[in-house]
From Swiss-Prot:
Subunit structure as annotated in this protein's UniProt entry: Part of the 50S ribosomal subunit. Contacts protein L20.
Biological process per Gene Ontology, one example term: translation
Family: Belongs to the bacterial ribosomal protein bL21 family.
Record carries keyword Membrane: no
The keyword Transport belongs to this UniProt entry's keyword annotation: no
InterPro entries: bL21-like (IPR028909), bL21-like_sf (IPR036164), Ribosomal_bL21 (IPR001787), Ribosomal_bL21_CS (IPR018258)
GO CC field: cytoplasm; ribonucleoprotein complex; ribosome
Record keywords: Ribonucleoprotein, Ribosomal protein, RNA-binding, rRNA-binding
UniProt-recorded name of the protein: Large ribosomal subunit protein bL21
Upper lineage: Bacteria, Pseudomonadati, Pseudomonadota, Alphaproteobacteria, Rickettsiales
């Protein structure tokens, strides 16, 4: 089964066994979390079920993502600024998708 879940401010298309990287969740590695904000679930016959279902996932790690570089330049002024940051992310393995 496939499911569209919303975690943080993003939506992910997930299936059982898939590893995804989402915005930080306050849970220790090894814990089981339940994602209740499920937008759509596709069953085996590809019929959509909207607004129902749950997705369970296991927390694999708490990490930091890749560096995002912000570069601002004002043309003809010899003025530029380079800045960057790394977001905290949680690595999840989807263990179950149910209706």
């Amino acid at each position: 089964m496939l499911a569209v879940v919303e975690q943080g401010s993003k939506q992910y298309l997930v299936r059982k066994g898939q590893v995804i990287s989402v915005e930080k969740i306050s849970a220790e590695p090894g814990k089981e979390v339940e994602i209740s904000c499920v937008k759509c679930v596709l069953d085996e016959e590809a019929r959509p079920h909207f607004g129902v279902g749950t997705v369970k996932a296991k927390v694999l790690a708490q990490e930091r993502g890749e560096k995002l570089v912000i570069f601002k330049k004002r043309r003809r002024k010899n003025s530029r600024r380079r800045n960057g940051h790394r977001q905290y992310v949680t690595i999840l393995r989807v263990t179950d998708v149910t209706l």
